Curated annotation (Swiss-Prot):
Protein name as annotated: 2-isopropylmalate synthase
Disulfide bonding pattern of the chain: none
Family annotation (PROSITE patterns): AIPM_HOMOCIT_SYNTH_1, AIPM_HOMOCIT_SYNTH_2, PYR_CT
Region of interest called Regulatory domain, as start-end residue ranges on this chain: 456-573
Family listed: Belongs to the alpha-IPM synthase/homocitrate synthase family. LeuA type 2 subfamily.
Organism: Streptomyces coelicolor (strain ATCC BAA-471 / A3(2) / M145)
Length: 573
């Protein structure tokens, strides 16, 4: 059938296509990725510089600690010569004992100016492992428009910068620092391949890589300009033509201007790249850097260990959202609120049958479901492997962006809300922000939470307030609860029996006309030690309403009763 599309009015003549690479015997299409690459996170540099409101020192530290916890061994921590804030952050993590694990290398970026190089190297004094990353733009438009220099002029910038890095490293860094060097011909994707090779060779001639003296050559798609296949061709060509290849770590740094950064990174690995630089969830300039989470989880979904821990993907997201003051899209691969949810009835039916088939297969083999190969329609991985459950995600299939609120409550107030309670509370915050506009501060979030869930002794509300209670257990294991209470303003004593204090309290509430059914109950300690308090969360059906309540007390039984009162009072508020 003929293509009926018509020419558009857009000025396509303004643009030219990308250059093809003359490499007829390319080998990368026949390769497979069977091991994880070296990873470098540049969230604290490339990611941070792209934020409207760059991270505060506290948020930077939270991001650094997250990256370390996840298992990243190379972390670009800033551009210390760009300002005092970045310099001070680098110094703070170096000077704090134990902040940087012994097997983690920090990296810092610099341009090829002597004053900047000196300041950059100075920031690394005392570091156990450190890399200086020097870059200069090499593409024709930069040579012509920005620097107004020849090829030789641009190459000399790279050579002189490399020499200065070596000199200042020898002058300022002691023997306790395991020093590394990285060079990037910025705008590699727009640079002629022969010139990119010429510059890299000149840099290596200066640095003299060899046994025990690696050089990292990073070939950035500073702006993504071609298909991933052409990007792979460029990497294979460079890998074939670089001298001293055995002493070179060939690194890829894709951006997502064409929306294919993940594919470009994966094909570059197939073409011989050793290392990938990127950011969690694709944060970065313009359309972002390549997404390290998607790359790692793509490996995981193919049975390849990414050597990064994504087992609590929502905790990673909460911290990321707090640090970046941004939200992860609900359709973001592997982590978005909707990615394990199917709205189509036929999809849901296929998923259910897939679960049933796996359970039957596991039973027939005499093993658990976790011991057999994952095979469920529409679910590329088992959501449980990243801390999710299919049922829980279904409950939030129209929600997004709740991680930041949960992060504030957990980190500021030690409250780890159950997932469904997060959803319930986030609706209250959303209503407040819709009504008032603008940002909502952590203090305001806590004020809303207290007013909604926790009793205010200065301004009590709700049908019920409880005071002292006592539980006894008979020989049959039945608990009887007696509790002093105020119901509708009148003091009374409530008495009920059941299988445990909560069941007994539900029975007692029936005596004052309140019918409560338990749907879910969770609890955790908020701290350690003799004065530790417990937080109890209870989901109740009260009439035709389903609501959560919370109770906080040093005694877990009292905390659970307070949680019931919280839910009941909310239902009648």
């Amino acid at each position: 059938m003929a293509n009926r599309q018509q020419p558009s009015p857009m000025p396509t003549a303004k643009y030219r296509g990308y250059d093809q690479v003359d490499i007829a015997d390319r080998t990368w299409p026949n390769q497979r990725i069977t091991t994880a690459p070296r990873w470098l996170s540049t969230d604290l540099r490339d990611g941070n510089q792209a934020l409207i409101d760059p991270m505060s020192p506290v948020r930077k530290r939270a991001m650094f600690d997250l990256l370390v916890k996840m298992g990243y061994k190379e972390i670009e921590v800033g551009f210390p010569a760009s300002g005092q804030t970045d310099f001070d952050f680098v110094r703070s993590i170096i000077e704090e004992p134990g902040a940087i694990p012994d097997d983690v290398t920090i990296s810092v970026l610099t341009q090829a100016r002597e004053d900047l190089i000196e300041r950059t190297v100075e920031s690394l004094k005392g570091a156990r492992r450190a890399t200086v990353h020097l870059y200069n733009a090499t593409a024709p438009v930069f040579r012509r428009v920005v620097f107004r220099g020849s090829r030789d002029d641009i190459k000399q910038i790279a050579v002189d910068g490399t020499r200065l890095v070596m000199e200042y490293a020898e002058k300022l860094l002691g023997p306790e620092t395991e020093f590394g060097y990285q060079y990037s011909p910025e705008i590699f994707t727009d640079t002629e391949l022969d010139f990119a090779l010429e510059v890299c060779e000149a840099v290596m001639d200066t640095y003299q890589p060899g046994p025990g003296r690696e050089i990292i050559l990073n070939l950035p798609a500073t702006v993504e300009r071609s298909t991933p296949s052409t990007h792979a061709d460029r990497f294979e060509w460079m890998g074939r033509n670089l001298s001293r290849r055995e002493h070179v770590c060939l690194s890829v740094h894709p951006h997502n201007d064409r929306g294919t950064a993940v594919a470009a990174a994966e094909l570059a690995l197939m073409a011989g790249a050793d290392r990938i630089e990127g950011c969690l969830f694709g944060q970065g300039e313009r359309t972002g850097n390549v997404d390290l989470v998607t790359l790692g989880m793509n490996l995981f979904s193919q049975g390849v260990d990414p050597q990064i821990d994504f087992s609590d993907i929502d905790e990673i997201r909460r911290t990321w959202e707090y640090c970046n003051q941004m939200e992860v899209h609900p359709r973001h691969p592997y982590v978005g609120d909707l990615v394990y949810t199917s709205f189509s009835g036929s999809h849901q039916d296929a998923i259910k049958k897939g679960f049933d088939a796996m359970e039957a297969d596991a039973a027939a083999r005499g093993v658990t479901v976790d011991d057999i190969e994952w095979a469920v329609p529409y679910l590329p991985i088992d959501p449980k492997d990243v801390g999710r459950s299919y049922e829980a995600v279904i409950r939030v299939n129209s929600q997004s962006g709740k991680g930041g609120i949960a992060y504030v409550l957990k980190n500021d107030h030690s409250l780890d809300l159950p997932r469904r309670m997060q959803i319930e509370f986030s609706k209250l915050i959303q209503a407040k922000t819709d009504a008032e506009g603008g940002e909502i501060t952590p203090t305001a979030i806590w004020d809303v939470f207290q007013d909604e869930y926790l009793p205010n002794p200065d301004n009590p509300w709700g049908r019920i307030q409880v005071a002292n209670g006592q539980t006894t257990t008979d020989r049959d294991g039945v608990d009887t609860l007696t509790v002093d209470a105020t119901v509708d303003g009148a003091e009374t004593t409530l008495v009920g029996s059941g299988n445990g204090p909560i069941s007994a309290f539900f029975h007692a509430l029936q005596g004052v006309g309140i019918d409560v059914r338990l749907l879910d109950y969770q609890e955790h300690t908020m701290s350690e030690g003799a004065s530790a308090q417990a937080a109890s969360y209870i989901e109740c059906a009260i009439g035709d309403k389903v609501l959560w309540g919370i109770g906080i007390d040093a005694n877990t039984t009292r905390a659970s009763l307070k949680a019931v009162v919280s839910a009941v009072n909310r239902a009648t508020r």
